[in-house]
Design a protein with these regions (language model features):
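Short, small/acidic-rich helices and loops at N termini and domain boundaries
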Residues: 1-86, 272
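Glycine-biased, small-residue-rich flexible motifs in mid-sequence functional cores and linkers
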Residues: 1-5, 84-314
């Protein structure tokens, strides 16, 4: 592990600091190593950290041996550390103003993953919705696209299983890389890691919370060129994923359902800017969108300096 990666690993453990805060911190001091070595008063003067956080940075800098040992344990467990500065960092994710500065990766990321589609939806789909998620996942993978989802119960799990039947899948965790949530998907996670990848931005040992799961949704949107919402009600995490995709200029497809339980979700997504399609149209529409170029970064996201103070932290 390089000295720079070690510094990113240490900063990733700063309490209450999310991706935007960490990127501003490193931008101000020029490198993660310099940020760790900065005097407390300069850290406070930056305006992004509280005095307690600034003192915590100082403590992290003094604990290099701990993070070196953590790095060795992660490597032994098959986990790679990938920083925003690495050439093989996911290219579409890099465009987000709040892209994670550090990813924990179990499995492999390949160049072909640049053509990826997120398949998301409710944790409690109808039997028809679960079947649709599996069919869409398998059809996308059979066309050579990587299927991205969040490993949750319901639509996510069905989409992952469908994709694995024909190709690759990536699961974005809302917990540490060593804490699969839900636990009943540990076997599925192992399958995904063997042929695709598990990703997390969270320090090892972090438990999933509402906040970390919401933060996870932006990564799903950022990794992909198009999002398919298979089935959802009129609220939930699918809307967060769809909103971030649309903000980044990436299309969202919502599969139409006539059942009252799910019709409201489709209607709300359409008002948000999603294109409503029938299931039989979804895969072809996603393939067309995935083959189109992404908007240039200036159009897709605000510059880091213009990013709002809202930050995902844990």
């Amino acid at each position: 592990m390089t000295r720079r990666t070690l510094a990113w690993l240490a900063l990733n453990h700063l309490p209450g600091a999310g991706a935007v805060t960490l990127r501003r911190l490193v931008s101000r001091f020029g490198s993660p190593e310099a940020a760790l070595e900065a005097p407390v008063h300069e850290l406070v003067a930056l305006g992004s950290l509280t005095p307690d956080q600034a003192r915590a940075v100082e403590r992290l800098a003094l604990d290099c041996a701990h993070f070196e040992e953590l790095g060795r344990r992660l490597h032994a467990a098959g986990t790679r550390l990938l920083t925003l500065e690495d050439d093989d960092y996911p290219p579409h994710l890099r465009l987000l103003r709040d892209a994670p500065p550090l990813l924990y990766v179990r499995g492999s990321l390949l160049p072909r993953d640049a053509v990826a589609v997120a398949v998301v939806g409710t944790r409690t789909p109808s039997p028809q919705g679960a079947a649709a998620a599996a069919e869409v996942g398998e059809s996308l993978a059979a066309r050579g696209m990587t299927v991205v989802s969040g490993l949750a119960l319901g639509v996510d799990g069905a989409a992952h299983r469908g994709a694995l039947a024909a190709g690759r899948s990536i699961a974005v965790l809302g917990s540490g890389i060593d804490r699969v949530t839900p636990a009943k998907h540990e076997g599925l996670a192992a399958q995904i890691a063997r042929s695709g990848a598990l990703l997390s931005e969270l320090p090892p040992g972090t438990r999933a919370t509402r906040e970390t799961l919401l933060a996870r949704n932006r990564i799903q949107a950022g990794l992909t060129k198009v999002v398919i919402v298979v089935q959802c009600r009129d609220r939930g995490g699918s809307f967060a994923t769809a909103r971030r995709a649309l903000q980044a200029g990436r299309p969202v497809l919502a599969i139409r359902w006539e059942e009252p339980e799910f019709a409201g979700g489709v209607e709300r997504l359409e008002k948000t800017g999603a294109r409503v399609v029938r299931q039989v149209e979804a895969v072809a529409a996603a393939a067309d969108a995935a083959s189109a170029p992404l908007p240039c970064p200036a159009q897709a996201e605000m510059a880091l300096g213009d990013a709002p103070d809202v930050d995902y932290a844990w």
